Amino acid sequence: HRSIRRQRQMCIRDSLGRPNNSDPNFSLIKIADAMSELLDNEKVMFIDAIHGSKVEEAIKNQKSKIFLLENLRFDEGEINNSLDFAANVTKPFQTYIFDAFGAAHREHASVVSFGNYLNSYQGPLVSEELKELNKILDTNKSGYSVLLGGAKISDKLSLIENLLPKVEKLMIGGGMCFTFLKALGYEIGNSIFEESFVAKAKFLMDSKYGDKIVLPTDFGVTESIESNIRSNIKVEDFQENHIGVDIGNETLSEFSRILNASKYIFWNGPMGIFEIDEYSTGTREITKVISMSQAYSSVGGGDSVSAINKFSDRKKFNHISTGGGASLEFLEGKKLPGVNIYKPLII
């Protein structure tokens, strides 16, 4: 917002979804008014084009101070990282600020090639995200706890491998815990798990860092997710027809004890099917525990953010990442195409 005030004109470029050609359902026109409200009702003019004469004429005629242009992914040159596309899009402009951290893991034209044609900077959001994520990677001391949830170990295996040596405790809930329990020989009924990752889960638990992993000891279960009927059982009491849908009270108590004793918490992923009230207790209570903790709290992942929006207040958390897949890949130790390729913008 401060940089907008200093510019004669600014064009905002963005992408949305995975549209098939110019699918109107993915047009950015619907966000122009909302963007104007966020900018203290300063007029945001929408241009239904990505590049070309329509864009150049609007800028030349100075019809507005702020422009929002159409979805970049309406042109396959964006996803294919076409240099011709990048050259055409950037033609009317002098300066480029890349501030879409959520796309930094994609080798798209707007991420890696627009900057070749303009005086380019890394935006403040990207810089802030990197600062916060580096805190997670650089934290290698007592009192550092990680809480992971969600459905699949395959989505977070590299994350576990990279963070496990650094943490004091790594708690695992959600559907992904059942792959670990399967590896330990437990009956898990009809709960979701990934057969191809059972051996890897066993390897992690048998490693020299395996004693840092904390798994649930009790669960909320159902025989049919659609029934919204929940029973609470110990892990050793799983029956063949049970489906695990939430962590149980004993696990909630142990996870809460660890979190309350922590100095730094990184949370990614819900503890169960929190969208259904009967299965939401674990996620709801964990959200409250972290929000009230004295620890520095960092949260990543869309479902975790949805849980915060549903059960708590975003202001009670020190950092909520906008990155999604970009955050996970960075924390896995991967080099992201859009990170540190431009000099940081100083506002």
Listing of model-derived features with the role each one plays in the protein:
Residues S15, E70, D99:
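Divalent metal-coordination and catalytic microenvironments
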Residues A34, L39, K43-P92:
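An acidic, phosphate/nucleotide-engaging active-site surface
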